[in-house]
């Protein structure tokens, strides 16, 4: 703890009010946070009963309900009432909140008295002033005027004796009895009335004290009453048996008036204290309503409005309903526990500025408050103070301890600078993995000692990383991450800090001695001074190093063996790499060579072939967009609509500046349409390259990427002018205006006849089906051979593309899909071409991808009601580490009970219309509430080549009702069986199941047979029998579960009216915040699966697609299925070199 030197704490209004409940005179306690701060006083305002004066909010008296002590508060302001609202941006706190400092010179009491009265009260005064609000607060305390002993004797005299309590009879037997003495409430109420008449009405008449008279019945008699009346300036006359005012012949002095005023309010406190309606039924209404002083103090002292961090505390403070103990740290800063962080900072800065000798004390208080709250705001404040050399005592203590030294206090330091450095370097040698923390400790000592030598040393030797683990942590990867992935992640981190990313890779490259990472550094123009050492290797040593005995292993299996070996022994990565390289050279393996150079197995075709799709190059972490473009390209009607956009675009939106259209239930503005049209033209350009290029891969344009990923801002949509080309002089537009658009009234009929056409189509031969598809005539050149330029509707500058921070980041794939489909749907008009038998394609996108859901709610108050919703994808959640796709879909369509507030409703979901292409998104990115961070679920989802949706489609005729009931009943039975198994196999705190526990207990009981413990000799047998019972029941439950699952799996085998075939599998490898995307697509025509991995498109074995991915972070995040009767619209290979000019 820091050394304290006469603290002078500036107090907030809240703190000062709290302290008035504790202290009652000038003392050290006001500025001692560690002194007892328990509440002693509970103030109420003096009563104004019978007075006509208006309450003065700047000058008022209070009396304590506990001690009957008095508090006089006077507030002076130079410029009116200070603002007390919470500070806003650009308006300083100092202009709104008073900070009160105690004045050294105390004011004199404000009572003048010509003569000293034997009943005069003692008083003490204090004064505080606030420069921030130019206000002063003066407080005077006065002791209780009424003699405490006298009051005690009166109270004691009214208490019934023990004997009277024993002889007292029930009022039900002898009627109500009246005590010979008046109640205490009556006594104090009557006395208050006498004083009120004197003070308010100047009533100076004598008061008769005749036996059994009014005074005796209401006040009492005896020595104590006479003494009390004397203090109230009434003298008892024996001869006349009355009380005569002692001030009848002269006006009251100021001191007498004040004393009687104080006495009157003390009598009110006493009367309220002894008010008991049960003992005295005559008491009904309270003549003295209590007004607590807290609201008046809050108003007078300028308590601000603020967002309390402890609302319960604030409520109690404002209501003054209970004692509020405060932490010494808050007291040290002159605040209360509920002040928000911004106020904490303000008062902390005030204390430092006005009490520089005790800065460390206030820093300690701030550190303690941060430890209580753990807020980033206070953490940053502490960090900023650290840069100014202000460090808390506990941090200094910990810093010295870290270096193996005892903490010291200046200015006479026991350790020399050389000793400090010696301890620092010793600590680094002992714990190099904690280098950063140890350096921070040295810096802390430098600040504490105000040593420029230490601080300059720390600054001059600063590095981005001090351990390789820090490099891994900054990149957000694990130590076993492959070299190629390390380089990929580093490229992503370039956007945050390219220099730091390079430094991180250097650390990892040197720790692994990785040639891949050294080459990466060289490619970025940052070669490392270190180079990978050459490891001598021959063929025999290479196989032995990898632990491979079968030299006939294929290249891909050998690469997997190498990968596992590096993961298990990363410190040997260089030797293992040399072994794989040696084997690759001996085999002349193109696959191994490619893997060592690029870190993947995707070998591009050596020569572009018309039988192979073209890949898309990835230059900015846009692999997910590449996957999406390839997916849309293989859907023939969508591809044709885009390629023939000149014929299919919405001319009305081009020609009519006021035109609008609806997409997805919302209005599309003209600027949105023109932007979408430009996107479709850019996509057409890329599609043409995918068809005509002789290269194995092509590069998507930056404009296409920008338009696909970056939506219009709200301001751009409202303005309607951003980047829109002037179409009035467009030659292309004038040509379009000559065309006419025919709206086909039979569109609905064609859509309804879709199924019939499909049946007719299946009767055709493959050759006939192929001939029915016309080759697109691309408008690439006119009759004169001149190149035709692509029309421009929306201008995107290079500056816009380069300045877009989102362009190179991995976006949410679902958002990207929605944005791309929205632009395609917005740009297309009615399509007259029905060659793919999709009907009148007024809404091609919706016909392909959209279905309709029906949600039904059933509750007691409103009965059954339904609503419908269009969907383009279904999101399925992951419930277990392993599940089937049907299990995941069950979670979407299962009937559940939902809370509707006042009642519970049953909700069911079904499909009324199915899309041609069904898109299922697997919800892999989830949120960890403990860490507050997103994470990726790698749970395995088992899916097949086929998917039947019959069980999820609306059962309109009720024929499937019994089957559906059985389906869901089986699921509930399976869950009950699983719960029972879980109960039997639940582990205890030592991770032992009930069977293990019983087994150990049985062995222990058997070993105790010869001991003196009173153990039943049959206990081991009993326990073993119980073990057998548990094992037998678990086996039975597992068999039952397997049987029910088997029945449930095949329950709908004969229901295939709504059957789908697997079309595409979108895969993500990595974590929630980074990774790589690729897609598997099923080529139905050639019956192969291809892997679309950026520029590499390769045929893969289907086992790679359907493999169990448990424990692997490369897994599907979206599955798409196509209805069996529409497989003909998928054309994966569409190449034609002759179209290239």
Curated annotation (Swiss-Prot):
Annotated Pfam families: RPT, UCH
Class of the enzyme per the UniProt entry, highest EC level: hydrolase
CDD domains in the cross-refs: Peptidase_C19J (cd02666)
EC numbers on record: 3.4.19.12
Active site: 623, 1076
Residues recorded with modification Phosphoserine: 113, 722
GO terms under cellular component: cytoplasm; cytosol
Superkingdom assignment: Eukaryota
Residues with Phosphothreonine modification: 112, 115, 721
GO biological process: negative regulation of ERAD pathway; proteasome-mediated ubiquitin-dependent protein catabolic process; protein deubiquitination; ubiquitin-dependent protein catabolic process via the multivesicular body sorting pathway
Region entry Disordered, spans: 748-770
Protein name listed in UniProt: Probable ubiquitin carboxyl-terminal hydrolase 2
Provenance organism: Schizosaccharomyces pombe (strain 972 / ATCC 24843) (Fission yeast)
Taxonomic path: Eukaryota, Fungi, Dikarya, Ascomycota, Taphrinomycotina
Gene name as annotated: ubp2
């Amino acid at each position: 703890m820091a050394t304290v030197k006469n603290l002078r704490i500036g107090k907030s209004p809240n703190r000062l009010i709290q302290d008035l409940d504790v202290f009652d005179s000038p003392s050290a306690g006001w500025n001692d946070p560690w002194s007892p701060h328990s509440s002693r006083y509970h103030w109420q305002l003096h009563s104004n009963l019978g007075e006509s004066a208006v309450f003065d909010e700047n000058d008022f008296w209070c009396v304590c309900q506990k001690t009957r002590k008095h508090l006089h508060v006077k507030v002076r302001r130079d410029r009116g009432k200070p603002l007390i609202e919470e500070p806003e941006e650009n308006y300083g706190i100092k202009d709104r909140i008073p900070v009160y400092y105690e004045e050294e010179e105390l004011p004199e009491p404000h009572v003048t008295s010509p003569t000293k009265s034997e009943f005069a009260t003692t008083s003490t005064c204090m004064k505080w002033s606030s420069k921030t609000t130019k206000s002063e607060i003066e407080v005077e305390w006065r002791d209780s005027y009424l003699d405490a002993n006298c009051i005690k004797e009166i109270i004691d005299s009214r208490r019934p004796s023990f004997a009277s309590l024993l002889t007292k009879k029930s009022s039900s037997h002898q009627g109500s009895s009246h005590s010979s003495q008046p109640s205490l409430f009556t006594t104090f109420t009557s006395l208050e009335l006498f004083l009120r008449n004197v003070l308010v009405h100047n009533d100076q008449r004598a008061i008769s004290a005749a036996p059994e008279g009014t005074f005796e019945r209401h006040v009492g008699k005896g020595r104590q009453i006479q003494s009390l009346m004397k203090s109230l300036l009434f003298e008892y006359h024996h001869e006349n048996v009355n009380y005569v005012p002692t001030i009848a012949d002269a006006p009251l002095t100021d001191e007498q008036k004040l004393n009687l005023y104080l006495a009157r309010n003390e009598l009110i406190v006493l009367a309220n204290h002894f008010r008991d309606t049960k003992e005295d039924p005559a008491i009904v209404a309270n003549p003295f309503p209590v007004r607590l002083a807290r609201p008046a103090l809050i108003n007078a002292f300028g308590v601000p409005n603020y967002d309390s961090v402890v609302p319960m505390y604030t409520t109690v403070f404002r209501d003054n309903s209970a004692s509020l103990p405060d932490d010494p740290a808050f007291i040290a800063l002159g605040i209360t526990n509920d002040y928000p962080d911004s106020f904490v900072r303000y008062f902390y800065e005030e204390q430092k500025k006005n009490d520089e000798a005790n800065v460390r004390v206030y820093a300690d208080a701030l550190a303690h408050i941060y430890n209580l709250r753990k807020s980033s705001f206070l953490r940053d404040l502490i960090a900023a103070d650290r840069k100014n050399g202000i460090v808390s005592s506990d941090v200094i203590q910990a810093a010295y301890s870290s270096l193996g030294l005892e903490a010291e206090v200046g200015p006479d330091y026991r350790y020399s600078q050389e000793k400090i450095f010696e301890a620092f370097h010793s600590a680094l040698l002992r714990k190099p993995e904690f280098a950063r923390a140890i350096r921070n400790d040295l810096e802390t000592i430098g600040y504490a000692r105000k040593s420029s030598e230490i601080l300059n040393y720390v600054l001059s030797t600063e590095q981005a990383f001090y351990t390789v683990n820090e490099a891994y942590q900054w990149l957000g990867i694990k130590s076993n991450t492959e070299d190629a992935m390390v380089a990929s992640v580093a490229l992503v981190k370039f956007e945050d800090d390219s220099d730091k990313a390079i430094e991180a890779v250097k650390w990892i490259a040197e720790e692994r001695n990785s040639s891949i990472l050294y080459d990466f550094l060289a490619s970025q123009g940052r070669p490392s001074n270190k180079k990978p050492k050459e490891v001598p290797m021959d063929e025999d040593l290479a196989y032995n190093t990898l632990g491979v005995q079968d030299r006939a292993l294929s290249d891909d299996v050998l690469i997997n063996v190498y990968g596992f070996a590096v993961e298990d022994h990363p410190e040997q990565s260089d030797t293992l790499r040399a072994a794989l390289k040696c084997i690759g050279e001996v085999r002349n393996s193109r696959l191994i060579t490619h893997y060592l150079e690029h870190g993947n197995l995707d070998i591009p075709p050596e020569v572009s072939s018309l039988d192979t799709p073209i890949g898309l190059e990835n230059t900015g972490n846009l692999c997910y967009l590449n996957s999406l473009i390839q997916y849309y390209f293989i859907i023939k009607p969508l591809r044709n609509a885009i390629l023939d956009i000149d014929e299919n675009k919405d001319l009305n939106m081009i020609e009519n500046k006021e035109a609008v259209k609806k997409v997805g239930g919302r209005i599309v503005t003209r600027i949105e349409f023109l932007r979408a049209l430009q996107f479709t033209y850019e996509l057409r350009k890329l599609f043409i390259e995918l068809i005509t290029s002789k290269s194995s891969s092509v590069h998507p344009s930056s404009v296409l990427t920008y338009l696909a990923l970056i939506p219009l801002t709200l301001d751009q949509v409202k303005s309607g002018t951003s980047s829109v080309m002037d179409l009035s002089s467009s030659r292309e537009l004038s040509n379009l205006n000559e065309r006419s658009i025919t709206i086909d009234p039979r569109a609905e009929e064609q859509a309804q006849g879709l199924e019939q056409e499909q049946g007719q189509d299946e009767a055709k031969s493959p050759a006939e089906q192929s001939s029915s598809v016309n080759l697109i005539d691309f408008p690439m050149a006119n009759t004169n051979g001149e190149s035709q330029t692509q029309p421009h509707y929306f201008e995107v500058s290079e500056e816009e593309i380069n300045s877009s921070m989102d362009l190179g980041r991995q976006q949410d794939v679902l958002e990207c899909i929605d944005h791309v489909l929205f632009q395609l749907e917005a740009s297309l008009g009615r399509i007259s071409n029905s060659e793919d038998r999709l009907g009148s394609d007024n809404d091609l996108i919706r016909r392909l991808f959209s279905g309709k859901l029906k949600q039904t709610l059933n509750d007691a108050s409103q009965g059954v009601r339904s609503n419908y919703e269009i969907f383009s994808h279904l999101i399925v959640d992951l419930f277990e580490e392993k599940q089937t796709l049907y299990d995941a879909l069950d979670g979407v369509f299962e009937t559940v009970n939902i809370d509707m507030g006042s009642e519970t409703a049953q909700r069911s979901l079904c499909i009324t219309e199915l899309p041609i292409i069904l898109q299922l998104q697997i919800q892999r990115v989830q949120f960890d509430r403990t860490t507050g961070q997103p994470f990726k679920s790698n749970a395995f989802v088992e899916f097949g080549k086929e998917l039947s949706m019959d069980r999820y489609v609306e059962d309109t005729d009720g024929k499937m009702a019994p089957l559906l009931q059985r389906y869901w009943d089986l699921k509930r039975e399976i869950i009950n069986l699983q719960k029972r198994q879980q109960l039997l196999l639940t582990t205890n705190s030592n991770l032992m199941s009930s069977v293990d526990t019983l087994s150990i207990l049985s062995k222990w009981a058997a070993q105790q047979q010869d001991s003196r413990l009173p153990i039943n000799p049959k206990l081991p047998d009993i326990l073993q029998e119980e073990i057998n019972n548990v094992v037998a029941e678990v086996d039975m439950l597992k068999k039952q579960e397997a049987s029910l699952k088997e029945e449930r799996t095949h329950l709908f085998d004969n229901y295939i009216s709504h059957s789908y075939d697997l079309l595409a599998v979108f895969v993500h490898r990595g974590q929630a915040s980074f990774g790589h995307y690729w897609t598997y697509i099923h080529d139905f025509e050639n019956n192969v699966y291809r892997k679309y991995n950026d520029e590499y498109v390769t045929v893969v074995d289907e086992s790679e697609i359907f493999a169990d991915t448990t424990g692997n972070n490369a897994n599907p995040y979206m599955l798409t299925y196509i209805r069996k009767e529409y497989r003909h619209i998928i054309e994966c290979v569409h190449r034609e070199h002759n179209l290239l000019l």
